[in-house]
A protein has these predicted regions:
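Catalytic cores of secreted/periplasmic lytic hydrolases that degrade extracellular macromolecules
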Residues: 1-168
């Protein structure tokens, strides 16, 4: 899916989520674009890469291959495919290729709605919610709070925000 197609298809859902939560629709689309590969890797309507909580019902989760970064070499996942030493932003880390459990949704609309609720219900994103109307500031704060393990997460999202703005 092209960035233009992604924006056309999912901006309505992002606008509904923005109206309910105040989180910028552009920020929502940027995160969805990155986490889903511009809609090319949407399994179980999971656009945002939200991991399932321990104890989640089997019907509400799915095992998906993903990449994680950590300074530790001893992390645990349901399935570890590989662990490779890497340097990211001048920091020695380990790149994990793993299978982990992620949320599953009945529809794209449900996923976009739950995306905003996720931030509101998790105290670690309190500072991000203070700047929720500014897509770059919000996404930078989300990255700083630990949403993703990739140290380049905020920079990548900032580039995607610019791409989305060109396609609205």
């Amino acid at each position: 899916m092209t960035p233009k197609d992604f924006v056309t298809a999912y901006l309505p859902f992002a606008k509904i989520a923005e109206a309910k939560t105040g989180i910028s629709a552009i920020a929502i689309l940027a995160q969805g674009a990155l986490e889903s590969g511009w809609g090319s890797a949407v399994v179980g309507n999971s656009f945002f890469g939200v991991k399932s909580l321990p104890g989640a019902l089997a019907a509400d989760k799915q095992l998906i291959t993903t990449t994680e970064y950590s300074r530790r070499q001893d992390l645990k996942f349901p399935v570890i495919l590989s662990v490779t030493p890497v340097v990211r932003n001048g920091v020695k880390m380990f790149k994990y290729s793993v299978k982990d459990y992620f949320e599953k949704y009945d529809s794209a609309a449900e996923c976009f709605e739950e995306h905003g609720n996720f931030f509101i219900q998790n105290a670690r994103y309190k500072s991000a919610l203070l700047v929720k109307s500014d897509p770059v500031k919000f996404l930078t704060a989300v990255a700083k709070a630990g949403y993703a393990t990739d140290p380049n997460y905020a920079a990548t999202l900032t580039k995607i925000v610019a791409m989305i703005n060109k396609n609205i």
